[in-house]
């Protein structure tokens, strides 16, 4: 069983509430079959809670109630499955092109009984028109200048992109601002999530999209 510190447990209890047991089971999947199948590196096991699950789950505070969220490049379900567990009000579509990852994701979803998750085996650019998302999330997919083109079109002209980034967030925004504006991004900002819960809060880039000619 993956160890969890007192501080991590306190944060997890606040984020996941009565669904904490589901989060613990998800972490065990990451530590066992997730590692065996190459979705998570073995060295990450001791920090699955802090660096991965909690780091992702805290972005739920940036997502409105009852949103349909498309998670691009879901991989091991970070942040998609974290959000599905923390927020049963959300409808999640996990977009992942690699078959072995899709198979693993489906096994975990089935085991946890997550009825608010759909998994699509495809590339983000091919999913345009197939997903009607209010919010698009991503973590460790690519630089923002490229990521904008993979995420914004999934919003059908309006909504938000919430991308987990690191210390280079502001620099990435500067480099991507022309692309973002061209795609319909009207406001881009850096948001810090989990300041009161985590020792190292999560930095996200938030893009509000409202493309001319499109209505909510």
UniProtKB/Swiss-Prot annotation:
Top EC category: transferase
The EC number(s) this enzyme carries: 2.1.1.-
Cysteine disulfide partners in this protein: none
Entry keyword Cytoplasm: yes
UniProt KW keywords: Cytoplasm, Methyltransferase, rRNA processing, S-adenosyl-L-methionine, Transferase
Highest taxon listed in the record's lineage: Bacteria
Alphabetized Gene3D superfamilies for the sequence: Vaccinia Virus protein VP39
Gene Ontology molecular function terms on file: rRNA (guanine-N7-)-methyltransferase activity
Protein name: Ribosomal RNA small subunit methyltransferase G
Naturally occurring in which organism (per UniProt): Paenarthrobacter aurescens (strain TC1)
């Amino acid at each position: 069983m993956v160890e969890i510190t007192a501080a991590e447990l306190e944060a997890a209890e606040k984020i996941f509430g009565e669904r904490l047991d589901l989060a613990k089971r998800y972490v065990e999947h990451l530590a066992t079959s997730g590692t065996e199948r190459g979705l998570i590196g073995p060295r990450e096991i001791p920090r699955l809670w802090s660096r991965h699950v909690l780091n992702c789950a805290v972005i739920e505070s940036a997502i409105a109630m009852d949103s349909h969220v498309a998670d691009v490049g879901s991989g091991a379900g970070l942040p998609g499955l974290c959000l599905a567990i923390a927020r049963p009000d959300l409808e999640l579509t996990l977009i992942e092109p690699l078959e072995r990852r899709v198979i693993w994701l489906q096994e975990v979803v089935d085991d946890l009984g997550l009825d608010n998750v759909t998994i699509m085996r495809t590339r983000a650019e091919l999913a345009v028109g197939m997903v009607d998302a209010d919010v698009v999330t991503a973590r460790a997919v690519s630089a923002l200048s490229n990521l904008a083109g993979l995420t914004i079109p999934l919003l059908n002209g309006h909504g938000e992109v919430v991308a987990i980034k690191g210390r280079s967030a502001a620099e990435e925004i500067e480099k991507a601002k022309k692309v973002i504006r061209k795609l319909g991004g009207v406001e881009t900002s850096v948001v810090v999530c989990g300041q009161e819960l985590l020792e190292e809060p999560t930095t996200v880039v938030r893009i509000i999209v409202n493309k001319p000619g499109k209505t909510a």
